[in-house]
Amino acid sequence: MATVPTRSGSPRQLTTKQTGDAWEVQARRWLEGKGLRFVAANVNERGGEIDLIMREGRTTVFVEVRYRRSALYGGAAASVTRSKQHKLLQTARLWLARHNGSFDTVDCRFDVVAFTGNEVEWIKDTFNDHS
């Protein structure tokens, strides 16, 4: 788990949520540096969550952010399982419906931004609603 120095100088453990939030901020900044525009973060719909929603031109990009300290056991990108993909699809479907859209009417894709150690990997169009 990551640590952060406190005012007293002794490190304090970050919670898993705090660590995840920090990597999501890093991913957002990194993607903005690549020209994407921020739409929303931590979108919750009926038990599912999308880390980031961005726009690239006319495309809505649903982003899953992953972090692993090392590539042992496949690294960050390998941790997006079929089950997780299904949950992301369901959450995106509900979000689109709330915004008067659907997979049939909105150009969208699912990306993964994976941080493994000090490396960042952007996997565009990782999966789709036809996977």
Swiss-Prot record:
Matching CDD domains: PoNe_Nuclease (cd20736)
GO molecular function: nucleic acid binding
Pfam families, alphabetized: UPF0102 (PF02021)
Location of the region described as Disordered in the Swiss-Prot/TrEMBL record: 1-20
Membrane spanning residue stretches: none
Residue ranges with Polar residues bias: 1-19
UniProt record similarity statement: Belongs to the UPF0102 family.
Record-linked PANTHER family: UPF0102 PROTEIN YRAN (PTHR34039:SF1)
UniProt name for this protein: UPF0102 protein YraN
Organism: Escherichia coli O157:H7
Source lineage: Bacteria, Pseudomonadati, Pseudomonadota, Gammaproteobacteria, Enterobacterales
